[in-house]
Amino acid sequence: MAMTAAVKDELSRVDVPKPCCRRAEMAALLRFAGGLHIVSGRVVVEAELDTGAVARRLRREIAEVYGYPSEIHVLASGGLRKGSHFIVRVVKDGEFLARQTGLLDVRGRPVRGLPPHVVAANVCCAVSAWRGAFMAHGSLTEPGRSSALEITCPGPESALALVGAARRIGIAAKNREVRGVDRVVVKDGDAIAALLTRIGAHASVLAWEERRVRREVRATANRLANFDDANLRRSARAAVAAAARVTRALEILADDAPHHLTSAGRLRLEHRQASLEELGALADPPLTKDAIAGRIRRLLALADKRARDLGIPDTEAAVTPDMLVV
């Protein structure tokens, strides 16, 4: 099951004992998923949802909290609609429900944001409003660089109200308009986990965090692999360059170099991929890595001085650009 569907399914089963929280959740659910229609002179309340469990929860809450009957109609998938959608419709008592849930104000005008009884309520109601908003029009992407919890809003007023509700429960959320659609977004991974926990999606938080950790481990492993590859390439280039310079040094000096320096140089040529520490261990008698490095360095310096005196190419000239392409 996709993350969004899993969260909505879990939220549809959250038990909310406090009446004020049930009203706040329902107000947000109807505000973010619903609309008011005038049919034959009567106000009809509708909410379109993409999860059957959420539609059944809304229908039950309307009956238990306000005592009004409602209908559920199923819209089969087709066209731009990827899956089945569910319409919860209140016809007979639509205007009463709209007034009681804050969709209409005392003068019968539509409320564009969240109703006052939600905006000015306790923190628990702010949490319930977020639960309702997510069940109505929320989405959660997989953890990663562009992970986000997002609510699609019916307008800028409701988006600002939802940002304010998030602030009251200690969550940083931002509202933005994308292609003419208002959205509220939470992008920080820790904030997403905290918000899901507050609204009651505990199992979904564990699954999301597990995927988040797995992705971070995979990204770290990839970075280390790339780092190791880069180190290997650098080491290979250094080995090729060192071998070329030592070969040229032995050509320049011929038999004039001290035996202990030429021995170190030949050891380098015989074991081109060995580290300095390994090279020192192969010497007879064994040398420290600093000692073997010092002997090779003196061999190259002696050869370069001889080359300058003779006016011939030195050891650096033996290193060609194509040798450094590994």
UniProtKB/Swiss-Prot annotation:
GO terms for molecular function: DNA binding. It comes from the Bacteria. GO terms for biological process: cell division; regulation of sporulation. Residues 275-308 bind DNA. Keywords: Cell cycle, Cell division, DNA-binding. Transmembrane segments: none annotated. Involved in cell division and chromosome segregation. Belongs to the WhiA family. This is Probable cell division protein WhiA.
